[in-house]
Curated annotation (Swiss-Prot):
Protein name as annotated: UPF0114 protein YqhA
Membrane topology: Multi-pass membrane protein
GO cellular component: plasma membrane
NCBIfam families: HI0507 (TIGR00645)
Length: 164
């Protein structure tokens, strides 16, 4: 009975495979939105004010960072929790595949969230005259919470690795 339960539990990891595949569909949706934004801005690029163009560019950078985060979570999560990715010899392989454990993935996700939050906060500050002060305050508080969380996770990881 114990062996049966263990085998079922171990096989249940494959329930995550469609979730990771769903992230690839989310990446397609993000890419479509990215190019929609490019197609929207290009015809009007000469009519846009510099600040408005910078806001659009920050939005594109933000989407790019989110896309990188999706790829990192999708591949590393699949490799850590479902199965090793078997990339054919001779095909291009990302050099970090198979080298990122759950802890390093968590730290990279935290760093990515801080970067995404920084870009978002910069976009908000570029339009600060149209954002109420209390909303600005909450954006900063939330961003600082992300920064502090990432710092604490990195510090705890360093302590854990140092003690082992």
């Amino acid at each position: 009975m114990e062996r049966f339960l263990e085998n079922v539990m171990y096989a249940s990891r494959w329930l995550l495979a469609p979730v990771y595949f769903g992230l690839s569909l989310a990446l397609i949706a993000l890419a479509l939105k990215f190019f929609q934004e490019i197609l929207h801005v290009l015809p009007n690029v000469f009519a846009l004010a510099e600040a408005d163009l910078i806001l659009v560019l920050l939005s594109l950078v933000d989407m790019t960072l989110v896309g990188g985060l999706l790829v990192m979570v999708m591949f590393s999560g699949y490799e850590n929790f479902v199965s090793q990715l078997d990339i054919s010899a001779g095909k291009e392989k990302l050099n970090w595949l198979g080298k990122m454990d759950a802890t390093s993935l968590k730290n990279k996700v935290a760093a990515s969230i801080v970067a995404i939050s920084s870009i978002h906060l910069l976009r908000v500050f570029m339009d600060a005259k149209n954002v109420p002060d209390n909303k600005l305050m909450w954006y900063v508080i939330i961003h600082l919470t992300f920064v502090l969380s990432a710092f604490v996770m990195g510090y705890l990881d360093r302590l854990t690795r140092h003690n082992h």
